[in-house]
Amino acid sequence: MTVGSVLSMKAGESQAKDVEKVQIALSQIVMNRREKALNYAVNYASLGYDMAGNLLAQRGILSQMDPEAFHEFYVQLLYVANNLSYWRGDTAKQVRTTIKDFIKKYQKSQRR
């Protein structure tokens, strides 16, 4: 096993943990679907939740995530984040922070 393969495995594990965190955040949006401030965000979050599940399943089967599917997940999160601006409360803050952190991390990884 080379150093590069070990680093690649660790990066994949980190990605999977990030996707899991976001999936939990998306589930919080869906669970709070009755809040008026989440009208559009619920549909976007529901699809994002499914996309996260598919990414995690892919990683379990193939030991890696499809870069194109990962990018599509990122784009979906942009839609979700854009529709959370009027949602208030502690849960809202945690969810927004989790999603924004993921978005920033993805954008930073694409600049390299």
Question: Language-model features: where?
Answer:
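Extreme N-terminal basic, low-complexity initiation segments
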Residues: 2-4
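N-terminal acidic leader/helix
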Residues: 6, 10-12, 18-54
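A general alpha-helix detector
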Residues: 37, 58, 76-80
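Amphipathic alpha-helical
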Residues: 52-70
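Short acidic DE-rich linear segments
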Residues: 110-112
